[in-house]
């Protein structure tokens, strides 16, 4: 996983520099412990976990190879612990945003994804809502049964919408930050998704950014840095970085154009 040039400023350096946490067929006790704590950290949004809160039964089943990593992730997200931290105290939209972040490692791409999960919860209930992420084709393709979910929203990959890049950083506020520490119970992407807008990205330590600005951004300009995405069959060569400054009202169209051209977005920031 190649690190981003702006990884330190955006607070994703620890993820960009680390390997996926995977439980292989032949495993050690230390590897199982690493998977357990990585799963807690990811699914619980970096929340501190007390000893009394641990899911001892699910941990034991994983240690005995009676359940997969995917099943353990499901057990955490289906638990009363997860409900207390993220379901009871948040609006439905905020809960769905966090489910995307915790279970798929990205932000919702558009309003239709929110509506889809609202419908699942309303018609089928809590467990079906959680299962809809973990049993999805997207989850299977990225994590399978053995990999702990990880943040993917800061990467540009095949099938990922470019709007997901800046929206991810409205939900993710740094490696040491926790979701509940943001003190946000309402949806953070409601405005952008409803208007099909893209918000600016601020460094993770910028005190001024704690959520979405819903003011008029029409006068802002944004600096975008891109590089040509490497083809799977092409030789590895050093790619040049391009920079472009664009007004807010042209930002969404430009991101779509860059995606069609096969360019990889490195960073988006206020100019």
From Swiss-Prot:
Q: Where in the cell is it found?
A: Cellular thylakoid membrane
Q: Which residues cross the membrane?
A: none
Q: How does it sit in the membrane?
A: Peripheral membrane protein
Where mainly found? membrane
Q: Give the highest taxon in the source lineage.
A: Bacteria
InterPro entries membership:
CpcD-like_dom, PBS_linker_dom, PBS_linker_sf, Phycobilisome
GO-annotated biological processes = photosynthesis
Q: Locate the CpcD-like domain: which residues?
A: 219-271
The answer to whether UniProt assigns keyword Thylakoid to this entry is yes
- The PBS-linker domain covers which part of the protein? 1-180
Protein role: Rod linker protein, associated with phycocyanin. Linker polypeptides determine the state of aggregation and the location of the disk-shaped phycobiliprotein units within the phycobilisome and modulate their spectroscopic properties in order to mediate a directed and optimal energy transfer.
- What protein does this entry describe? Phycobilisome 30.8 kDa linker polypeptide, phycocyanin-associated, rod
The species this protein belongs to is Microchaete diplosiphon (Fremyella diplosiphon)
Q: What is the lineage of its organism?
A: Bacteria, Bacillati, Cyanobacteriota, Cyanophyceae, Nostocales
């Amino acid at each position: 996983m190649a690190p981003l040039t702006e990884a330190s400023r955006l607070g994703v350096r620890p993820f960009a520099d680390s390997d996926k946490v995977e439980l292989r067929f032949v495993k050690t006790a230390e590897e199982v412990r690493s998977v357990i704590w990585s799963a807690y950290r990811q699914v619980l949004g970096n929340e501190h976990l007390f000893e009394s809160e641990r899911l001892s039964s699910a941990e034991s089943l994983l240690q005995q190879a009676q359940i997969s990593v995917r099943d353990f992730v499901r057990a955490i997200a289906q638990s009363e612990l997860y409900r207390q931290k993220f379901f009871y105290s948040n609006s439905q939209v905020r809960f769905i945003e966090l489910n995307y972040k915790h279970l798929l490692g990205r932000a919702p791409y558009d309003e239709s994804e929110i509506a889809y999960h609202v419908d699942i919860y309303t018609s089928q209930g809590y467990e079906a809502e959680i299962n809809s992420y973990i049993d999805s084709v997207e989850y299977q393709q990225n994590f399978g049964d053995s990999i702990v979910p990880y943040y993917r929203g800061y990467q540009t990959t095949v099938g990922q919408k470019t709007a997901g890049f800046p929206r991810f950083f409205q939900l993710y506020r740094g490696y040491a930050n926790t979701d509940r520490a943001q003190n946000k119970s309402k949806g953070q992407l409601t405005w952008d998704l409803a208007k099909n807008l893209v918000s600016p990205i601020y460094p993770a330590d910028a005190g001024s950014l704690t959520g979405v600005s819903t003011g008029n951004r029409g006068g802002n300009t944004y600096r975008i840095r891109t590089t040509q995405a490497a083809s799977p069959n092409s030789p590895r060569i050093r790619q040049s970085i391009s920079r472009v400054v664009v007004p807010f009202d042209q930002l969404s169209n430009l991101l779509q154009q860059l995606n069609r051209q096969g360019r990889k977005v490195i960073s988006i920031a206020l100019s």
